[in-house]
Amino acid sequence: MKSLFTIGYEQSTAGVFFDALTQAGVGLLVDVRAVAASRRPGFSKRQLAAGLDERGVGYVHLQKLGTPKEGRLAARSGHADEMLRIFERHLKTPEAQHELDELTALAKTSIARSSRPLCLLCYERDPAHCHRQRLADELHARLGLKVEHLFCAPV
């Protein structure tokens, strides 16, 4: 069974993060943040894409698969369940469905063309408190991928 990875960069450095991806053999990182910017050095879209490129890892940003602002605010307030309910509603929108189909196609291509798996990226360290778990579950249901979560050592 082919694998799909997920990773969050909360409490990590770019170096530790890149090492985790390299050790797992990731070939494509799919950024599922609504806003691909970060106060953490190395995790904003351009810096992240450049760091991945240096390591031979592709980068795609699927903005519409990110959690809407009201969901991010709920998560920051410690209301992960509310964030997930908001994300479930958002996932039913045509824009999110289109990008979910695009994500599925990327995963299929990754499986067909490469032995290097795809990895979903968001901020939250714990996948149980992050919408990327829901997206990973969807890819498992659609393609039968085994979901594995990568964890960066906190610094």
Positions of PLM-derived features:
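Residues lining hydrophobic/aromatic ligand-binding pockets adjacent to catalytic sites
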Residues: 1-155
